[in-house]
Amino acid sequence: MAKEKFDRSKEHANIGTIGHVDHGKTTLTAAIATVLAKNGDSVAQSYDMIDNAPEEKERGITINTSHIEYQTDKRHYAHVDCPGHADYVKNMITGAAQMDGGILVVSAADGPMPQTREHILLSRNVGVPALVVFLNKVDMVDDEELLELVEMEVRDLLSEYDFPGDDVPVIAGSALKALEGDAQYEEKILELMEAVDTYIPTPERDSDKPFMMPVEDVFSITGRGTVATGRVERGQIKVGEEVEIIGLHDTSKTTVTGVEMFRKLLDYAEAGDNIGALLRGVAREDVQRGQVLAAPGSITPHTEFKAEVYVLSKDEGGRHTPFFSNYRPQFYFRTTDVTGVVHLPEGTEMVMPGDNVEMTVELIAPIAIEDGTRFSIREGGRTVGSGVVTEIIK
């Protein structure tokens, strides 16, 4: 069978289902695919196909996730669903499945539960831009007032974590009934997708963002100058443009006088390209692995930040023992390790392998970071944790 051509004319977005265990995330995922399949926009997926999520390795961490795709009239979606709570935590922190938006599933019969709260907090911390709510299992609730109460609770909870609780679309339905083909509830799934289409903002493509390239290697070409190589993480770079060299030392400016890829000279390079950038007036020792080349003013070096961190369990090859405040591991940002000191939040004595925690980190050298920058925590070259920057302190 010939592979279908990927349709680029539609906007693409990555979304996922989040919420408390057994509130119906996987059933909803199956229902969306199945209902949209009737419109010819998707391939029907059974609950079991989605629930038996394959294991994936991301930064050495084992995560179970199911990826399915479907389309609405407006967009093409890649949808991620995780079977277990721990998988969600790992997924969101490592960014294994980047989410441009989320569907928060809350059982109308139970209302918000501990993981509902935790998933909202995680979404806020790792920078999921928008959430839409699906109140599930409404067929099990006879009392209209109870439904309104649950909706109010969910809205308050979202507001508590800085999502616009009053404006978030809330759609009430039954994923199971929709999956069974009940027309009234199928309509609710279409209503939900309409809300996702309109309320979740179109993600900015990597190539439209300001230029940044982590430096992987540096060498000098006699008579031409210094070349920094790496993969362009975002944006574009044209020959003749100015860039800043950021991190580890004081920031300096230079001009890119040549861009090379696979030994061919290019006029410009964009996100995803592996390139060599020829830098004007830069000595070989002025640029090193671990720094980034970036559009002037787009990103700044910092030494202190808050982060949401997942600590690998012993089974994942992580630590066998807990750690405490003043723990000093290596923080691996993009292409290099930098030593840092961990400060745990008040009331947290220690962190056990398998936990997730919000911590403050102080690095011994400045690194180009911003909200949403991902990193690994390492000890002697092995990964013991994974994190994402949630707030810059200095």
UniProtKB/Swiss-Prot annotation:
<dbReference type="InterPro" id="IPR004160">
    <property type="entry name" value="Transl_elong_EFTu/EF1A_C"/>
</dbReference>
<keyword id="KW-0963">Cytoplasm</keyword>
<dbReference type="InterPro" id="IPR027417">
    <property type="entry name" value="P-loop_NTPase"/>
</dbReference>
<dbReference type="GO" id="GO:0006414">
    <property type="term" value="P:translational elongation"/>
</dbReference>
<protein>
    <recommendedName>
        <fullName>Elongation factor Tu</fullName>
        <ecNumber>3.6.5.3</ecNumber>
    </recommendedName>
</protein>
<keyword id="KW-0342">GTP-binding</keyword>
<dbReference type="Pfam" id="PF03143">
    <property type="entry name" value="GTP_EFTU_D3"/>
</dbReference>
<keyword id="KW-0648">Protein biosynthesis</keyword>
<dbReference type="Pfam" id="PF03144">
    <property type="entry name" value="GTP_EFTU_D2"/>
</dbReference>
<dbReference type="InterPro" id="IPR005225">
    <property type="entry name" value="Small_GTP-bd"/>
</dbReference>
<dbReference type="InterPro" id="IPR004541">
    <property type="entry name" value="Transl_elong_EFTu/EF1A_bac/org"/>
</dbReference>
<comment type="function">
    <text>GTP hydrolase that promotes the GTP-dependent binding of aminoacyl-tRNA to the A-site of ribosomes during protein biosynthesis.</text>
</comment>
<keyword id="KW-0547">Nucleotide-binding</keyword>
<keyword id="KW-0460">Magnesium</keyword>
<dbReference type="InterPro" id="IPR050055">
    <property type="entry name" value="EF-Tu_GTPase"/>
</dbReference>
<keyword id="KW-0251">Elongation factor</keyword>
<feature type="region of interest" description="G3">
    <location>
        <begin position="81"/>
        <end position="84"/>
    </location>
</feature>
<feature type="region of interest" description="G1">
    <location>
        <begin position="19"/>
        <end position="26"/>
    </location>
</feature>
<dbReference type="GO" id="GO:0003746">
    <property type="term" value="F:translation elongation factor activity"/>
</dbReference>
<dbReference type="InterPro" id="IPR009001">
    <property type="entry name" value="Transl_elong_EF1A/Init_IF2_C"/>
</dbReference>
<feature type="region of interest" description="G2">
    <location>
        <begin position="60"/>
        <end position="64"/>
    </location>
</feature>
<keyword id="KW-0378">Hydrolase</keyword>
<dbReference type="InterPro" id="IPR000795">
    <property type="entry name" value="T_Tr_GTP-bd_dom"/>
</dbReference>
<comment type="similarity">
    <text>Belongs to the TRAFAC class translation factor GTPase superfamily. Classic translation factor GTPase family. EF-Tu/EF-1A subfamily.</text>
</comment>
<feature type="binding site">
    <location>
        <begin position="136"/>
        <end position="139"/>
    </location>
    <ligand>
        <name>GTP</name>
    </ligand>
</feature>
<feature type="binding site">
    <location>
        <begin position="81"/>
        <end position="85"/>
    </location>
    <ligand>
        <name>GTP</name>
    </ligand>
</feature>
<feature type="domain" description="tr-type G">
    <location>
        <begin position="10"/>
        <end position="204"/>
    </location>
</feature>
<dbReference type="InterPro" id="IPR004161">
    <property type="entry name" value="EFTu-like_2"/>
</dbReference>
<dbReference type="InterPro" id="IPR033720">
    <property type="entry name" value="EFTU_2"/>
</dbReference>
<dbReference type="InterPro" id="IPR009000">
    <property type="entry name" value="Transl_B-barrel_sf"/>
</dbReference>
<dbReference type="GO" id="GO:0005525">
    <property type="term" value="F:GTP binding"/>
</dbReference>
<keyword id="KW-0479">Metal-binding</keyword>
<feature type="region of interest" description="G4">
    <location>
        <begin position="136"/>
        <end position="139"/>
    </location>
</feature>
<feature type="binding site">
    <location>
        <begin position="19"/>
        <end position="26"/>
    </location>
    <ligand>
        <name>GTP</name>
    </ligand>
</feature>
<dbReference type="Pfam" id="PF00009">
    <property type="entry name" value="GTP_EFTU"/>
</dbReference>
<dbReference type="GO" id="GO:0005737">
    <property type="term" value="C:cytoplasm"/>
</dbReference>
<dbReference type="InterPro" id="IPR041709">
    <property type="entry name" value="EF-Tu_GTP-bd"/>
</dbReference>
<feature type="binding site">
    <location>
        <position position="26"/>
    </location>
    <ligand>
        <name>Mg(2+)</name>
    </ligand>
</feature>
<feature type="region of interest" description="G5">
    <location>
        <begin position="174"/>
        <end position="176"/>
    </location>
</feature>
<dbReference type="GO" id="GO:0003924">
    <property type="term" value="F:GTPase activity"/>
</dbReference>
<dbReference type="InterPro" id="IPR031157">
    <property type="entry name" value="G_TR_CS"/>
</dbReference>
<comment type="subunit">
    <text>Monomer.</text>
</comment>
